[in-house]
Regions:
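Transmembrane signal-anchor helices characteristic of membrane glycosylation enzymes that use polyprenol
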Residues: 1-66, 233-242
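Transmembrane-helix signature of polytopic, membrane-embedded enzymes
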Residues: 106-109, 128-149
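Specific aromatic-rich, kink-prone transmembrane helix
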Residues: 129, 164-181, 190-196
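Short acidic/glycine- and proline-prone juxtamembrane loop motifs at membrane-interface regions
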Residues: 156-163
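Perimembrane helix-loop-helix junctions
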Residues: 173-183, 207-238
Length: 242
């Protein structure tokens, strides 16, 4: 709950502009996932994708930020360019939100800001289920989840939130089973493997995370053939980045 409230607060109070890493690219992923055909762009949306002056200019006061929002909203009705759709699994939640907001005629500012809410929700849910699985170390995970950088990324267009959140779930199931007596259940194995596989879909550079399930203690594995077969499926799952 605290993660969600903190992230939403950051989202709402942050000035509009290029305030995070590669906003132009990540917003393009989101808006490209908002349609199954060509995606129409309004002038302010194109400003985001091209880092136009009206979008990236700095504002120092509330009044300046309000004026900037009004300037961007002024030309948000007309479509001036079309781009190809490109549905991505990690950007799809934001894409669906953007599509719904467009359906109801929301202006650019509302679309841009509320399109980030699914990112906050996914991150918050990942943190919740990860902490729920651990027997001890919940506070350590909570501290990591509440790092200002993590919250800031979660309140902006980014697929890094997806990586952080699902890695937390995967690690929680791995560590949680190490803390328990008995063998690893098939259910926990599947959840752990899927979490790691989903986490690295946006960035295959994190491929090393798929090795973690293979490091489970031997005495925790009841059926080694079955366990390692499930772990190997992660390499197949990660290929399904739509």
């Amino acid at each position: 709950r605290l993660v969600f409230i903190s992230s939403i607060t950051m989202l709402l109070v942050s000035p509009i502009g290029h305030i995070s890493w590669d906003i132009d690219s990540h917003f393009k992923f989101a808006i490209s996932s908002s349609s199954v055909a060509y995606v129409g762009l309004s002038e302010p949306e194109l400003e985001v994708l091209t880092n136009g002056a009206d979008f990236i200019q700095n504002t120092d006061t509330y009044v300046q930020n309000t004026e900037k929002i009004n300037t961007l909203n002024k030309n948000s009705d007309a479509i001036i360019k079309y781009i190809d759709h490109n549905i991505s699994l990690t950007a799809l939640p934001s894409g669906v939100m953007i599509a719904l907001l467009r359906l109801f005629g929301a202006n650019f500012f509302v679309i841009y800001k509320l399109g980030q809410i699914p990112i906050v929700l996914i991150y918050s849910l990942c943190c919740y289920f990860a902490m729920r699985r651990l027997h001890s170390g919940k506070m350590i995970l909570a501290v990591v989840a509440m790092f200002p950088t993590s919250l800031f990324i979660a309140s902006n267009y980014s697929y890094d939130t997806w990586v952080i959140g699902f890695v937390m779930i995967g690690m929680a199931y791995f560590v949680g089973n190490c803390q328990e007596k008995g063998v690893v259940s098939t259910k926990d194995t599947i959840i752990m493997v899927i979490a790691f596989a989903i986490a690295i879909i946006p960035k295959q550079i994190y491929l090393a995370f798929l090795v973690i399930p293979f490091l489970m203690k031997q005495d925790k594995i009841e059926n080694k053939k079955k366990y390692y077969s499930i772990c190997s499926m992660a390499f197949v799952i990660m290929l399904f980045d739509l």
